[in-house]
């Protein structure tokens, strides 16, 4: 796996990788991470992958981090942990 770029964002760490014919977009926030795989056949360049990271996509991903935290918290509560 080859790291192509760190993409600055104020709320999450975003890293772009190339691996096995795919671009991997990795978003990290606290203890959570999301990885999106984009086939190199679906885009023409790394710039196209960066274009996918528009305001709507990032807003949805950040909301998903909140949902992930809520899900984990609820699981801890259900099991009295």
Regions found by a protein language model. Name each.
Residues 3-6, 31, 35-37, 56:
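Residue-level preference for alpha-helix termini and adjacent loops
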Residues 19-45:
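A short, structured beta-strand/loop element
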Residues 2-27:
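Amphipathic, interaction-prone secondary-structure segments
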Residues 42-81:
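Mixed-charge, Lys/Arg-enriched low-complexity segments
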């Amino acid at each position: 796996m080859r790291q192509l770029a760190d993409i600055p964002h104020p709320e999450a760490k975003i890293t772009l990788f190339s691996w096995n014919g795919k671009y991997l977009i990795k978003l990290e926030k606290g203890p959570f991470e999301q990885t999106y795989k984009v086939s190199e056949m679906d885009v023409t360049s790394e710039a196209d992958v960066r274009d996918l990271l528009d305001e709507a996509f990032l807003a949805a991903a950040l909301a998903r981090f909140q949902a992930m935290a809520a899900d984990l918290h609820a699981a801890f509560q259900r099991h009295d942990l």
